Amino acid sequence: MAHSIEELAITTIRTLSIDAIEKAKSGHPGMPMGAAPMAYTLWTKFMNHNPANPNWFNRDRFVLSAGHGSMLLYSLLHLSGYDVSMDDLKQFRQWGSKTPGHPEYGHTPGVEATTGPLGQGIAMAVGMAMAERHLAATYNRDGFEIINHYTYAICGDGDLMEGVASEAASLAGHLKLGRLIVLYDSNDISLDGELNLSFSENVAQRFQAYGWQYLRVEDGNNIEEIAKALEEARADLSRPTLIEVKTTIGYGAPNKAGTSGVHGAPLGAQEAKLTKEAYRWTFAEDFYVPEEVYAHFRATVQEPGAKKEAKWNEQLAAYEQAHPELAAQLKRAIEGKLPDGWEASLPVYEAGKSLATRSSSGEVINAIAKAVPQLFGGSADLASSNKTLIKGGGNFLPDSYEGRNVWFGVREFAMGAALNGMALHGGLKVFGGTFFVFSDYLRPAIRLAALMGLPVIYVLTHDSIAVGEDGPTHEPIEHLASLRAMPNLSVIRPADANETAAAWRLALESTDKPTALVLTRQDVPTLAATAELAYEGVKKGAYVVSPAKNGAPEALLLATGSEVGLAVKAQEALAAEGIHVSVISMPSWDRFEAQPKSYRDEVLPPAVTKRLAIEMGASLGWERYVGAEGDILAIDRFGASAPGEKIMAEYGFTVDNVVRRTKALLGK
């Protein structure tokens, strides 16, 4: 170590981590003990951040992708002066504490992302770096480099084994994200044992092939060597950098260092005592921080951070004078607000016009893109099918970062995680598209978006067996039920173009949850009532889209998406036979469940017990709405390859079958 205060600070990070994990009787000490020098060097010598304001917009972003090493992050947050107290450290992994087992965004000040599912932190960091480049290209002007921060991540071997890290690293290299720097805690150990049991690839050649700069630090305790590598990484703005730092997991533990035993379990009282002796730590008290360490962090983090933000605020004030309209637009974007009156840009569709909801979604995207400049997104190599292209929006590429169309390539998981990073970064309203059946490929990222409360928008097209000829591999069955089961995710399957416009409006208005828009490939008719009723109806999750003509329905037809049009046609056929039913459009179960019982009973009158649910997906869940006297027309087997109309007929999604099933319910 160059200076004793630096050695003391690093040892303090290590001992705080050891003590918190011992007290919790649970946790992962090995990574914080091994990676403390690189994290300390980054936080005190390179990162621009202000603990007094964790939300300073131009701060450097830091993602601990190896989220199991959370005590490394919590120790740094505490020492740096973030609102994480010593009592918080003592409550590590306990009910209601600020220091959960893995870092959680929105839960702990200074935590930039929820991590723990390995690989996703790297991909979220890629998304943050993408957001920084786009916003810099959009808003920076001569003399005003308002947005120019770096994005840093610390990852481990496990992160690099995950497929999402490969997808994201490939994308980052392609996009030449030079302000992205990943420190790789390379300790040759995984949870199960030595790394050579499962991982022997040449990481350097792999990342160089992706288009990254690769640097290596041989001694993970040598902070001068680490600092030199970080300087070199920051100097190359033409490509992202991976810095492999060779470390010893559980550094200093005389019996456990360098073994898998120190990865995911407390050291134990005796080993903890011996480790502190090995560190020449002379303080008997647990959770002890020498006053000079606090002073050191004040001098290296808090004071410089406050000055840097103050200087940035001065620059922003001058920018507001020089570019008032641009500055107002940026301020609004940072605050997550939409332009006044933007919803007037939403198209309204006349009854009778047939249009696939993926196509109306594409029209909505292009209409709102003109009114909402922070709209930014793309597709996983399906833009022409998902209809996600912003016409005239330009391409987000190394020579045109101001472009609004992102070409994610066939990297669904990286797309999902990068969208999370963009949403975490702020300043953008982001969306990503793929086929609904491939939502499985990005599901873990959707789950993290829901867990973090991020308003990401998913454009999921080709939503049923109506896909047809491509067959069962491309026909979603269980996917609606699966996504509906996820907490804090709004799933909307609109019936027509007006419901689609309403769904987009609700998705953009969301501030605390992601939205999945589930859209058809095939044309569907625009229904008579939706121009007037769609927004409030979709907002409430379900509504009577076509009431029984006599005002006294004998039965209810409940449907979503393209099946609503089918239900309306069946309603007409039943009426011709003197049977009166109401049609309920139920685009969003989660929104409907959030309504008061009085509204739910208004839409689904308890007295009308004969109910038929119609949906081209799994039946699971519909029983709560149809009740004991109802019936469900759904699909609980895989699809088939044939023209869509033929498959729908074979699976019973015809007017004749709906009429027959309804009459059977009524005993007619």
UniProtKB/Swiss-Prot annotation:
Family annotation (PROSITE patterns): TRANSKETOLASE_1, TRANSKETOLASE_2
Catalytic residue positions: 412 (proton donor)
Presence of the UniProt keyword Magnesium in the record: yes
Residues annotated for Mg(2+) binding in this entry: 157, 187, 189
Activity across pH: Optimum pH is 7-8.
Residues given in the record as substrate binding sites: 28, 263, 358, 385, 462, 470, 474, 521
Chain positions recorded as thiamine diphosphate binding sites: 68, 116-118, 158, 187, 263, 438
Superkingdom of origin organism: Bacteria
Record InterPro entries: THDP-binding (IPR029061), Transketo_C/PFOR_II (IPR009014), Transketolase-like_C_2 (IPR055152), Transketolase-like_Pyr-bd (IPR005475), Transketolase_bac-like (IPR005478), Transketolase_BS (IPR020826), Transketolase_CS (IPR049557), Transketolase_fam (IPR033247)
Record carries keyword Metal-binding: yes
Subunit structure: Homodimer.
Protein name: Transketolase
Name of the gene this protein is made from: tkt
